[in-house]
């Protein structure tokens, strides 16, 4: 399995990602806690900024209304290679 690096700019932390779980769960397992509610892309509470890289969604498209360009929903996405985020 190929690994990716998740860099979190505002807390100066890097995480090695080698699994098939969501970005939100990876962050939680590394003691980085985000606000969330639905874990399925409907509420939009967990949204964070994607500074660099790409993610893919496990659902067709998050349902949360009016998300901005470069905002992602870690509850229902996974990194496509290395990413840089701001939480």
From Swiss-Prot:
Note the CDD domains from the entry: fer2
Tell me which domain of life the UniProt entry assigns to the organism this sequence originates from: Bacteria
Which region is the signal sequence?
Answer: none
Free-text cofactor note: Binds 1 [2Fe-2S] cluster.
Keyword Transcription regulation among UniProt keywords? no
UniProt cross-references to SUPFAM superfamilies, sorted A to Z = 2Fe-2S ferredoxin-like
- Needs which cofactor? [2Fe-2S] cluster
Write down the InterPro entries for this protein, in alphabetical order: 2Fe-2S_ferredoxin-like_sf, 2Fe-2S_ferredoxin-type, 2Fe2S_fd_BS, Beta-grasp_dom_sf
The UniProt keywords, alphabetically, are: 2Fe-2S, Electron transport, Iron, Iron-sulfur, Metal-binding, Transport
**Ligand binding ([2Fe-2S] cluster):** 38, 43, 46, 75
Instruction: Identify the residues that the record assigns to the 2Fe-2S ferredoxin-type domain, covering every copy.
Output: 4-87
Gene Ontology molecular function = 2 iron, 2 sulfur cluster binding; metal ion binding
Protein name (Swiss-Prot/TrEMBL): Uncharacterized ferredoxin-like protein BU177
Which organism's genome codes for this protein?
Buchnera aphidicola subsp. Acyrthosiphon pisum (strain APS)
